Amino acid sequence: AKLEAAGIYDLMTIAVMTPSDLGDTAGISPAVARKAIQAARKMLDLGFVDGTEYARKRENILYIKTGSKNLDSLLGGRGVESRSITEAFGAYGSGKTQVGLTLAVNVQYPIEMGGANGKCVFIDTEGTFRPSRIKQIAEKLELNPDKVLKNILVARAFNSDHQILLLDKISEMIKNGEPIKLLIVDSLTAHFRAEFAGRGQLADRQQKLNRYIHNLMKLAESYNLAVYVTNQVMANPAQMFGDPTTAVGGHIV
């Protein structure tokens, strides 16, 4: 009952959690949480599989076209794939959000047409989501703009804690039958960067960001979602040669 109240309904969600996470979420002791996780992992038979079995699991991977043949080619030929996180970083106006908006439309196509026959969740941290642009993309593709917009679930995240909380909401929506196949976070690091200013808070920021990325990966793995995130850039003054521009977030990103 406590697990259901916390929005946890399946074994995989329990199996990939840490005892402290499960304990905090469900309001149970670490010892009880540890036993629950062990039981879930045993029932799911999580462990090693041979290459043939792993290849069979890979057959369930979904691919969503980006709208650019060249970009699809760079991503392996078929676009953004499920059960993984795809990051796009660049300067303001470089097209990161545009790719995300196009993916939000394309995910609604049938699988055989380069989509995933599902809905998109768009976590907007910087006020970049534009319904008018979605309508333009849909009209160009000869799709019903209003129907396309109804299949995109948008949430404006106002701080990093809100951004983290929204991931739990996504799990609840999927449990309630929403066919979500794409999660977009635009942008990944904006709130973390603003709230943890200065070198003195760098370690705290990196820990929180690292945990958030791990939660994104758990969502992607548990529900066979594709995750697309955009990221800001900064200049590395210590770099003597080449392009000093690098993605915000350091090695954990």
Residue spans for each PLM region:
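The Walker A/P-loop phosphate-binding site
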Residues: K2, A39, M43-K147
